[in-house]
Curated annotation (Swiss-Prot):
GO terms for cellular component: HslUV protease complex. GO terms for molecular function: ATP binding; ATP hydrolysis activity; ATP-dependent protein folding chaperone; protein dimerization activity; unfolded protein binding; zinc ion binding. Component of the ClpX-ClpP complex. Forms a hexameric ring that, in the presence of ATP, binds to fourteen ClpP subunits assembled into a disk-like structure with a central cavity, resembling the structure of eukaryotic proteasomes. It comes from Ralstonia nicotianae (strain ATCC BAA-1114 / GMI1000) (Ralstonia solanacearum). Residues 3-56 form the ClpX-type ZB domain. Zn(2+) binds at residues 15, 18, 37, 40. This is ATP-dependent Clp protease ATP-binding subunit ClpX. ATP-dependent specificity component of the Clp protease. It directs the protease to specific substrates. Can perform chaperone functions in the absence of ClpP. One of its GO terms (biological process) is proteolysis involved in protein catabolic process. Gene3D superfamilies: 1.10.8.60, ClpX chaperone, C4-type zinc finger domain (6.20.220.10), P-loop containing nucleotide triphosphate hydrolases (3.40.50.300). The gene is clpX.
Amino acid sequence: MADKKGSTGEKLLYCSFCGKSQHEVKKLIAGPSVFICDECIDLCNEIIRDEAAISEKEGGLAVKSDLPTPHEIRQSLDQYVIGQEQAKKILAVAVYNHYKRLKHLGKKDDVELSKSNILLIGPTGSGKTLLAQTLARLLNVPFVIADATTLTEAGYVGEDVENIIQKLLQNCNYEVDKAQRGIVYIDEIDKISRKSDNPSITRDVSGEGVQQALLKLIEGTMASVPPQGGRKHPNQDFLQVDTTNILFICGGAFDGLEKIITQRSDKSGIGFGAEVKSKEERDVNEVLPQVEPEDLIKFGLIPELIGRLPVVATLAKLDEAALMEILVEPKNAIVKQYQKLLAMEGVELEIRPSALTAIARKAIKRKTGARGLRSIVEHALMDVMYDLPNHKGVQKVVIDESTIAGDGKPLLMYEEQPKVAGSN
């Protein structure tokens, strides 16, 4: 009954759903011959929210509705990563298609879209890890970096491959739904290659065995992870994480792969019309983009793993010009970072072009790529950063070629006259 007569004869209105009178609730809203109170409306809203969350889990993972286009992804990568244009294009398309696929999940269709995991091949310090980190930050998804060299088969001393998923969960406060649409970057994947391209008769717990374990994770499995970082034991309840929709990016330097590619291309280039090139002429940057699955198998990756990494992007070895650009151009450029640090002391930092050239050449000589740039700049500025808080009146610090070479010290510019760091 929506209305009754009270003891005083007044007509009382009641909620048609919970039966409470108009005096027991804050608001009673009338419809055609029915009434609903504010408490029932709140309850209905809560039920709708819960059901929407359940259908989102079953029908498809929550993915950013404003997914950036490949061009927008590429532009964002350009702000942090210098060069590697082809690799950025390949990554932008692969990541866009992956998250577009997640939006498509749960829709009834004849076509099932497969996941496109990525393999990055390039020298140390060429930007493999930075590309993966930048992508995860752009898409605002959980991200974890795993080192393949620390992994072993289950049951052996070392990290289990499922520890990767545990770290991913930690990075998103153990929200399983978020982790299931995250990005995993596995570094040093080339270091777990089997020792020869023939299957081994002995146990290879940190090579082929790890590849087999990673294979299950990458292609999609239910990983059992102990809650809140606990250790595994038999009577424990595990969190179940489906890795089917996690994007895996594997990276490695693959030292020596260019020789395998060259040998293959030399065999196919025999005859009168073959172009003869000396080995010295064959630049790594020219050879690596010609990589084929058979080359990776010969290097020591198992065919099944290569099949699960269909998108292959090669990164070029960075030259002097690229390294100089990396020092000053990106949003998080090393020179900008040190200028900011010194600006906090009220001091301007100037690194002259000759010094930038010297830094780039030193990194090339060390064969550390962009990764080695920071340590060179840090070493050059160490004494200045140590002494600066105690020096009053310093306006500017100048770094030139001699500072990088170790022949001279940074120049401290005072209001009155220049003074060399460390001099009396």
